[in-house]
Amino acid sequence: MARADIFKEQNSMKKYHKKMGFAMTTILTSAMFFVGCGAETGDTTDTGEAVELTILAAASLTDVCNEIKTEYEAAHPNVTLNFSYGASGALQTQIEEGAPADLFFSAATKQMKALDEEGLMDSDSIVKLLENKVVLIVPEGSDKDITSFEDVATDKVGMIGLGEPGSVPVGQYSEEIFTSLGIWDTVKTKANYGSDVRTVLSWVETGAVDCGVVYATDAYVGENIQIVCEAPAGSCKQVIYPVGIVKASEHADAAAEFLAYLQTDHAMQKFEGYGFSAAE
């Protein structure tokens, strides 16, 4: 089955999945995780020392990371995970300005690379963990007959929601896509720019815009929206999510334990449940 079809099927079944909560899979995998967690990442828990980790994470990771937080804290009672979500560019700026952070989980390699080149990341810890896709969405029941990214340049679209290209990775990818199609100059005159991808999603959910460009994973958890299509092949860079330890972290060992957990098969099952895939 083509990936676009997979996400369309997921979009139509998401309310059922939310009700069921992937119940049997969660029960079985969680039981396995709790049995084995002490052997895998027991250092911080064994010492009894309370640790709070601050993780700056892209807004598109909100739902899955909130689930991971609940489970990880239950298995590691002395560890508190404090997630701060936002646009990757804004989070990059926070780290550059000295905001306390232990890990950075970006929605693009650009921001991670910049911080690493500035000497603000532990280079050896950086992992390209996840891959996402960029999709065009419309409000559920839209009568605009929008069927492609090319349609955004036509009279079918009066306003489109996009991430701010200067700070929001999905906005950068959007600009790349429309530029590759030769219609960016027209599209940008119709654009309403959001501070992060979830803002764009909310605009489409409420019908404030005719369409929007978001990640497939955001569309998967969205309400009252329809996926039109994925970005044309080769129209933008591969959407990779890197994660790494901030060099100024005061809890490097605990951060390394959590980073190791994010790379386990159990954690990847969580990410895949929200539409992400492992980066290749």
Regions found by a protein language model. Give the residues of each.
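A short, gly/pro- and small-residue-rich
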Residues: E118-I126
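Short, low-complexity disordered leader/linker segments with a strong preference
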Residues: M1-E52, F271, G275, A279-E280
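Short, glycine-/small- and polar/acidic-enriched structural segments
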Residues: I126-V134
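Periplasmic-binding protein-like
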Residues: A101-S106
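Exported/periplasmic ABC-transporter solute-binding proteins
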Residues: C37-A75, G89, T93-E97, A108-T109, ...
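Conserved beta-strand core positions
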Residues: L53, V79-L81, V134
